[in-house]
Structure formats: C-alpha cells, structure tokens
Amino acid sequence: MARIEAPQDALGRLIEALRVLPGVGPKSAQRMAFYLLQHDRNGAAVLAQSLGEAVETVGHCACCNTFSETQVCSTCSDERRDPSLLCIVETPADQVMVEQTLSFKGNYFVLMGRLSPLDGMGPNEISFDRLLNRIETPDTGVPIREVVLATNFTSEGEATAHYIGEVLKPKGIKVTRIARGIPVGGELEYVDAGTLARALMDRR
C-alpha cells in the first residue's frame, strides 16, 4: 500500500489540519481554509493565536478534571456549592449544559470520555481511578452522599453509568441516574435546558 505523503505547502497543511475537527471532511476543510484566506485573514490570525494560547495554557482541574487554566477550576472553588453532591458527566460540554439548567448545585467530575472497548476506551482512559479518589477522599473533607450519573443515553453512556454504579454500590453511597426525559441515544450537549433540568430533578 502506497504511503500517503503529508502536504508540503502551507495551504495543504492548513486544510489537513482543519480535518481534525469533528464532522469536517476534505471539502469542508478546503472551504474553511479558502474562506479564511480570501475573506478574513485577520480572523484567521486571531484564531491561530487563540488556539495556540489555549493549547499552552488550558489544562485539567485537579479536582473535577474539566478544562481549566488554573489548578482548581472556578466551579470547584465556589464555596456556595454543595460538596456532598457529585454529578458525573462525559465531557466539559455536558457539564456546561447541566450548569445552564440552574438546577444542580453540587460539584462535578468530568470523565473526558465513556467506556467503549471497541474504541480502546476502558476505565483507565476515562480517569476512573481519579473519580474513585474524588469520591473516597473528597478535597473538601465533606463526605459525598449522592453521586448523580449524567452520562449520555447512548449504549456507551449507559454502560459507563452501569459500571460506575456497580463499583459504587458496595460503598454505601447513594447513586442516582438522570431521568429518561432525554431520548434514547440522545447526548446532553444537544438537549434543551428545560428537558435536562427535569431529567435532573426526576433522577432516581
């Protein structure tokens, strides 16, 4: 099989780089590159600078594992939140969606993925050890009394919720799952705030 050579020119490398974005194929990447160079070179420069800064400065919160420029994110640093409640989500985008409902006042843990053996995603790849440590030895010193499983209602999300629930069951911690107001196969990122708020309130 012939080896595919990397683009040698700057335009080709830009098009290839844009293809790392989800849902962006060769033609979409080409349209983006042409648009930026033809219509908005200043915007392209700002985009390049902002992306470089984010890659250099954005890491993960030491407590909840979400994206953060500081060791502990603003949510985990907020003393008004209830440290005895912990909501587990798959991605930072899911955390943002839960926050927008204004119906959850506890803390979070972001898995940065979900169990999917076919994709090589096991417990180690979703920071499961860090999650257990967060639950067993909370940074706040306040024991966690309830864990809310807010993974997506996909087959992988359900498997992840089931796995976490089974591991936590012997520890005597209340484990709840958000209600099924969210369609089967649905992802939190695309659910409206009202539906998600009801799913949180009706958790069981």
UniProtKB/Swiss-Prot annotation:
NCBIfam families: recR (TIGR00615). This is Recombination protein RecR. Keywords: DNA damage, DNA recombination, DNA repair, Metal-binding, Zinc, Zinc-finger. It comes from the Bacteria. GO terms for biological process: DNA recombination; DNA repair. Residues 84-183 form the Toprim domain. It comes from Polynucleobacter necessarius subsp. necessarius (strain STIR1). Pfam families: RecR_C (PF21175), RecR_HhH (PF21176), Toprim_4 (PF13662). Belongs to the RecR family. The lineage of its organism: Bacteria, Pseudomonadati, Pseudomonadota, Betaproteobacteria, Burkholderiales. HAMAP family: RecR.
